[in-house]
Regions:
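Tandem amphipathic alpha-helical repeat scaffolds
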Residues: 23-38, 57-72, 92-108, 131-148, ...
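Helix-turn-helix DNA-binding segment
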Residues: 287-336, 340-345, 351-356
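Flexible inter-repeat linkers and adjacent short helices
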Residues: 1-87, 91-93, 109, 244, ...
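Linker/hinge segments immediately adjacent to helix-turn-helix/homeobox DNA-binding domains
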Residues: 141, 149-156, 167-302, 318
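Helix-turn-helix repeat elements of alpha-solenoid scaffolds
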Residues: 29-47, 65-81, 104-118, 143-156, ...
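Solenoid-like repeat scaffolds
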Residues: 47-56, 81-92, 117-130, 155-168, ...
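Small side chains
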Residues: 80, 98, 192, 308-311
Length: 356
């Protein structure tokens, strides 16, 4: 079949064109702007630094992020591999982070372990304060994402002063996530909302993640209407570009939001997300479980996991049924299957086999 879709100057179809390249007035540099700081005391501001990057490298950075957000892990990993050879530590460390996450999804754990060792070495020997700040954020974000944050030092205040606006907002997302893991749901929600107000829709990718985080916290507080609103905001931004990864990586803590808003309305999209959830969760647990007392199960389907998360977070069978528009008997049947699969008899034991 002939592809009649118009292509841009670099030979990419719209499907392959990163979000950065399609934002009017921003161009492909909008992804790299997250990595290079632009503050009054900088001797070399962001625009000048970015101008030194070859076009091919800027495009590779944007494609790496774009493919990952679309859950196209092999393609993203290939672009990350290219970017890991960059002479700029801001770029090659960011690429290493992406390389780790892609290979978690691909279940290539030997690659993941090697990359983690490399990242630890880099964080111990940063080239300058800006690179040290980015390393600090990446270190913290990875620990939070894999739910290993109990013994992790927080992001230092100094790191915020040496980062771009986009990186600072990403750091606020990570800190909000950490508060969520500490069950400080009201604080997590407040921080995410404040960051969204600061963002003012300037950074769409980060805005997706902040809305997802806010919806997680709101669900944990049983603020169902607010959770719906934040989730639908994230979906509204993400869907036109096929950015499903935020909903894959946060599926468990979203506690049924994916099921409520996507499962019946868009079954093909839900199947795509569910298939990737199973793949990604397997790799995620390979990182998380050996380093945590909580052993997250891989035995549940995404739908079973979502219902189990709602039950573990204190939702009654009636609340689950009302929220997902199913019968109480259906809820009971699914929870019975969950108990059987993980080998428990009490609702209170669920938390030992699920994400936080």
């Amino acid at each position: 079949m002939q592809d009649n879709e118009p292509k841009n100057s670099e030979g990419l179809t719209r499907e392959d064109t990163p979000l950065a390249a399609q934002q009017c007035g921003k161009g492909i540099n909008s992804i790299t702007e997250y990595l290079f700081v632009n503050l009054p005391f900088d001797s070399k501001p962001s625009d000048e630094m970015i101008a030194t990057l070859p076009d091919a490298e800027k495009n590779a950075i944007a494609k790496m992020a774009h493919f990952f957000l679309q859950a196209r892990y092999e393609e993203s990993a290939a672009e990350a591999k290219r970017c890991m050879n960059s002479q700029h530590p801001e770029v090659n460390t960011f690429a290493l982070l992406a390389h780790i996450l892609n290979h978690v999804a691909l279940n290539n754990m030997e690659v993941v372990q090697k990359d983690f060792q490399d990242l630890r070495q880099r964080t111990q020997h940063p080239e300058n304060k800006h690179v040290a700040a980015l390393n600090d954020i990446f270190r913290f974000a990875l620990s939070v994402f894999f739910h290993l944050g109990e013994a992790t030092a927080p992001i230092s205040p100094e790191s915020f002063s040496h980062c771009s606006e986009g990186s600072r907002l990403y750091a606020l997302y990570a800190q909000s996530y950490a508060l969520y893991l500490q069950q400080e749901y009201a604080q997590a929600l407040g921080m995410a909302e404040a960051a969204l107000m600061m963002d003012a829709n300037r950074h769409e990718v980060i805005c997706i993640y902040l809305n997802v985080l806010a919806s997680m916290a709101a669900m944990s507080l049983s603020y169902f209407d607010r959770a719906d609103r934040f989730f639908l905001n994230a979906l509204r931004i993400a869907k036109p570009m096929g950015y499903i990864q935020p909903f894959i990586g946060h599926h468990g803590p979203l506690q049924g939001l994916v099921e409520k808003h996507i499962r019946d309305r868009e079954p093909e999209l839900y199947k795509m997300i569910s298939d990737k959830v199973m793949l990604f969760r397997h790799g995620w647990t390979e990182v998380h479980n050996p380093q945590s007392q909580d052993k997250v199960t891989n035995l549940l389907t995404p739908y079973e996991f979502a219902l189990a998360m709602m039950a573990a977070k204190g939702k009654s069978n009636q609340e689950i049924a009302d929220y997902l528009n199913i019968s109480i008997n259906t809820v009971k049947a699914y929870l019975s299957i969950v108990y059987q699969k993980v080998g428990i008899t009490k609702r209170s034991e669920l938390k030992n086999y699920l994400v936080k």
